[in-house]
Amino acid sequence: MKVAAATRNPNKLRAIREAYRTFGFPAEVVPVDKPPGAPPQPIGLDAVAKWALERARHALAAAPGADHGVGIEAGVVEVAGYHLDITIAAIVDREGYVTVGTSPAFQIPTALLHDVLQGRELGATAEAHYGRPAVGYREGIIGLLTRGVVKRIDLNYAAVLMALTPRLPHNAPHYRKA
């Protein structure tokens, strides 16, 4: 199976490959550039989901031989007055069938929140605050906060696993293709 992913981030590419393999779908993951106009940090659940889906559709269109397009987008959501970072994965196939999954979410440190709510990417804000370059391509902010117990790849992997769940053969009868 050929899977196009709208990212060049090795962390996301590895998470996609591992999630597909976990469910028995051997996948060749092909990176493509992200779609134009993607915001540095989507804010709100709908915005995060929209850009995950935009990435998935863009990836599929950019790779004519691909069976699936995958988009992974992280962003900020507010829940009961708390701001959380969440990752959403969207998968689209050639028939237009879309499945979506999320990662666990974590509370964004208040020291970073102001800049993030002003539209600055959480990764860039964390890099400046913690003095750790390219954190988004490594352990992610969650890796810094948990001292490596949970890493960004874990969140990406979980989101892709959840997006793949409706596509498992035993689940197909329980989901309606849109």
UniProtKB/Swiss-Prot annotation:
Catalytic activity field: XTP + H2O = XDP + phosphate + H(+); ITP + H2O = IDP + phosphate + H(+)
Requisite cofactors: Mg(2+); Mn(2+)
Cofactor binding, per record: Binds 1 divalent metal cation per subunit; can use either Mg(2+) or Mn(2+).
Gene Ontology MF terms: ITPase activity; metal ion binding; nucleotide binding; ribonucleoside triphosphate phosphatase activity
UniProt enzyme class: hydrolase
Keywords: Hydrolase, Magnesium, Manganese, Metal-binding, Nucleotide metabolism, Nucleotide-binding
Family matches, as InterPro entries: ITPase-like_fam (IPR029001), Non_canon_purine_NTPase (IPR002786), NTPase/PRRC1 (IPR026533), YjjX_NTPase (IPR050299)
PANTHER family: NON-CANONICAL PURINE NTP PHOSPHATASE_PRRC1 DOMAIN-CONTAINING PROTEIN, PTHR34699
Functional summary from the UniProt entry: Phosphatase that hydrolyzes non-canonical purine nucleotides such as XTP and ITP to their respective diphosphate derivatives. Probably excludes non-canonical purines from DNA/RNA precursor pool, thus preventing their incorporation into DNA/RNA and avoiding chromosomal lesions.
Family, as annotated: Belongs to the YjjX NTPase family.
Protein name: Probable inosine/xanthosine triphosphatase
Organism: Pyrobaculum calidifontis (strain DSM 21063 / JCM 11548 / VA1)
